Each structure stands twice: as structure tokens, then as C-alpha cells.
Curated annotation (Swiss-Prot):
Residues 279-291 have a biased composition (Acidic residues). The active site is at residues 17, 106. Induction: By sucrose. Phosphoglycerate mutase-like protein lacking PGM activity. May play a role in carbohydrates metabolism. GO terms for biological process: carbohydrate metabolic process. Pfam families: His_Phos_1. The lineage of its organism: Eukaryota, Viridiplantae, Streptophyta, Embryophyta, Tracheophyta. This is Phosphoglycerate mutase-like protein AT74. Belongs to the phosphoglycerate mutase family. One of its GO terms (molecular function) is catalytic activity. PANTHER family: BROAD-RANGE ACID PHOSPHATASE DET1 (PTHR46192). Expressed in roots, leaves, stems, flowers and siliques. Residues 275-316 are annotated as: Disordered.
Amino acid sequence: MSPDNKLLPKRIILVRHGESEGNLDTAAYTTTPDHKIQLTDSGLLQAQEAGARLHALISSNPSSPEWRVYFYVSPYDRTRSTLREIGRSFSRRRVIGVREECRIREQDFGNFQVKERMRATKKVRERFGRFFYRFPEGESAADVFDRVSSFLESLWRDIDMNRLHINPSHELNFVIVSHGLTSRVFLMKWFKWSVEQFEGLNNPGNSEIRVMELGQGGDYSLAIHHTEEELATWGLSPEMIADQKWRANAHKGEWKEDCKWYFGDFFDHMADSDKECETEATEDREEEEEEEGKRVNLLTSSEYSNEPELYNGQCC
């Protein structure tokens, strides 16, 4: 299938796991490996409710009755359990596949976590910067960014090759069951947000759903399903919200020149392009006038040099 004819998923939906034992009491991390932390009873219920919301959302368009879902899930126990509960809302024929994907796992905070030491470490992280700080024996958000970027490349290859879209008449939805920071990094990578913008984002709640929906022009936006107020509570700035609204109707491949993080943050000292053009035009006119003056002088000199010399009123 050519890139021009590739079939894009209608939605890419990020879901954070339900409430875990570690969310309820961080002391759990001191005795239990992070990847083995389980959901609480409340977390299981949250995951079931998330499944019902997902089903209602995906099946809401009566003009697209033949929809399908493909799931990606982090290998951690709490995300796998969340997906298991979400799956109760879907019949088998609606799910075309599930893939456990290590690259969307939680940020590694460094093996067993001693409570007091972790509290002090997180204070240092706030001073250093949440994106670049690397936990001892663990990862930074920048490390997570690298592996999420790799995952996205694989995701796009699957889309380009139409590996997941079994039937072109089916409306496809991707659901990614992952973790709070990983979901924020995913959005950062997808929408090309800066480090500063990432550090202003708030973590999603347990079993919270964030929906990237395909707009009419072929670009994805958070502003189709979510309100401006929701986006603001997530930590998106007014400029970021405006960009999401633009993406909802933009044609794929269009360049939004007035996004400040694409240009203005680096080149705000430059002269306005219109003024620069006016200056260049003035300089060009001055050069042309100078050249014209030189040509006139040369012609005048030539005329005088070709006139016959006169002696006593007669030609010699």
C-alpha cells in the first residue's frame, strides 16, 4: 500500500492504569518490585469503568458500526490487569489484536525504593528539572522519551504497511494502556512539545483517558474530544490549546508558522520579515540608481571624446 493510501486509525487513546498499591501507599515499592505492584480493589473498579467509557466513545458514531480496537499494553502487572478489566467491555470480534510493548513501560526509578531516600531524591529532581533528572540506578524522563520515540517509529511502520487494519471498511482505534509519565512523554513526542512545556504538564489520574482523534484534514488533535477547560487542567498553555484547535481542522503536512516553540523561542531577535524585505528593496533601488548614474556618465564622456576638435572655428 502506498503512503498516500494508508489507512489511519480514527483514534489513538492513552489510558493510565487504575489505582495501584503503590499509589495508595508508596511503602509498597520498598518490598515489591515496581513491575509487580498490583491494582487495588478500587483500581480494578476504575479499570472496568474505563472500559465502559472507552466502549461508549468508540461505538458512538452510528455511521461507523464496523469499528475495531487494537491494544498496546505495558508489561507491568498493574497495566496488564487494567487491560484485562477494560476488555470486559468488548466482544472478541471487536478486538483485532493485543501487543505487550516494553517500550511503553513505567519510568524506572531504580530497583527497590527506600521511602525516605526517594523523598529526598524527588526534591533534588524538582531542583534539577523533571525531564533531565536521572534517578540513581534508574531513568530520566529523557530516557523514556527515547524509547517512546522508538515505539512511535514502529507504530508508524505498522500504519504505513497496513499491518493492523484487517478490513479497510473497519474504523480502527488504538488504545495504549500505560503509565502517567509515559503518556505525557508520548504526547510530548507526538505534538513536538518542548521540555519546558512538558514540565508544565500534570499527571493523568488513575484510569484517566486522553483521546487523540483524527481531524477532517488528516491530523490528530486532543481538542476534538476534550474541551479547552480539560486541556487547561492537564497543564496545556493557551498557545498549546490553540495549536490543538488548529490541528483539529488542519490538513496533514501544513506548517503552523505562529507556534512560538517552532520559531520564536529561538529567533525572536530577528527583524520582522516585512521590514527586512523593505530594507532589501531600498538597497536594491539605490544600487540600481548608482549603476544607472555610472552608465550615464560613461555615455556622456564617450560623446565628448568623439566630437572633432576645432581650431579657429574650423575642423582640423
